[in-house]
Structure formats: structure tokens, C-alpha cells
Amino acid sequence: MTALDIQISVEAGDWPPEDELQSFCERVLEAAADFLAREENQPLPAQAAELSLVFTDDQSIRAINAEWRGQDKATNVLSFPAFPVTPGRMPGPMLGDIVVAHETLRREAAELEKPFDAHLTHLLVHGFLHLFGYDHIEDDEAERMEGLETRILARLGLSDPYGDQPPH
């Protein structure tokens, strides 16, 4: 497994206890990093790559979204790469920050009829890919990123979040 140094902070929202969240996030993101290294030949720093995860609520993520993206609305996840990076290039020792909003996550999970943990896993993987330079603005980029998300989630035993197919 690829080593990550994951720092978490629960700022607001009805999240699970920090120790449970820490273990959960380590399992998900270590699997994602391992997948990128093995399947996509993504180079990783020799030392444990650092990233921070902030678990918050809709009010907080709305303020962050307005400040950094000019969108005055809550969203499910935001990612802030520490350094500009292109997929396949060596990232810096600090990958960046991922911020997740509890209410939006819970509402979307209910709408999608998915377990909370499954949707959280998807959002963590999605945010993590952004830290490596993946994006979904252009159709071809979105297709590539969604394909990676689907394959990583399948490795974790979860179905395709963009379709109704069970994992292979």
C-alpha cells in the first residue's frame, strides 16, 4: 500500500467520531493512491504524501465555495491541490485539502438511495483525484475521471456511481 499522512478535522456537522472517520478515510484513500500508482503509473513522493480532510456543514462549505470558486451555494466536496499538478506527474509532498459537507452528502445519498458511507467513499475518491490534477470540466476529462472513480470504487466493492452496474 502507498503511504499517506492524512490529517482530519471535524469542524461542523453530525459526523462519526474522529477515530472512526480517520480509519475509514485511510482505508479509502490508501486504496485510491495504490490504484493510481499501480494502474495509472502515478508517481508518488518517497515520503508519505500529506493531505488534510475537513468535515464540515453546508453553511461552512457554502462560504468556502463562494470565496474560492465564486459560487454562493453549498456543494458536496471541494478540493484544493497544494501545488498545480498534471495527472501522471510527481505531486509535491503536500497533496492538498479536501472539504466535505455533511448535509449535502446525506441528502445526495438519500436521493441516490445509496448508503452514507458509500457516497462518502465516492466523494473522497472524487476529491482525491482532483488533488492529482484530474478534472471534469471538459467531456473527455470527465469521462477519464469518472472511469477512474468507477474502477477505484469497484476495488473497494462499490458499484458504479454513474450507472446501475454492479462492480466487476
From Swiss-Prot:
CC annotations in GO: cytoplasm
Main function: Single strand-specific metallo-endoribonuclease involved in late-stage 70S ribosome quality control and in maturation of the 3' terminus of the 16S rRNA.
Short name of any one Pfam family annotated for the protein: YbeY
Organism: Rhizobium meliloti (strain 1021)
Cofactor: Zn(2+)
Localization in the cell: Cytoplasm
Domain of life: Bacteria
Catalytic EC class: hydrolase
Keyword set includes Coiled coil: no
Keywords noted in UniProt: Cytoplasm, Endonuclease, Hydrolase, Metal-binding, Nuclease, Ribosome biogenesis, rRNA processing, Zinc
GO MF entries: metalloendopeptidase activity; RNA endonuclease activity; zinc ion binding
UniProt similarity note: Belongs to the endoribonuclease YbeY family.
Primary location: cytoplasm
Name recorded for this polypeptide: Endoribonuclease YbeY
Cofactor note: Binds 1 zinc ion.
Entry EC no(s): 3.1.-.-
Binding of Zn(2+), residues: H126, H130, H136
NCBIfam families associated with the record: rRNA maturation RNase YbeY
GO process annotations (BP): rRNA processing
Gene name in the database record: ybeY
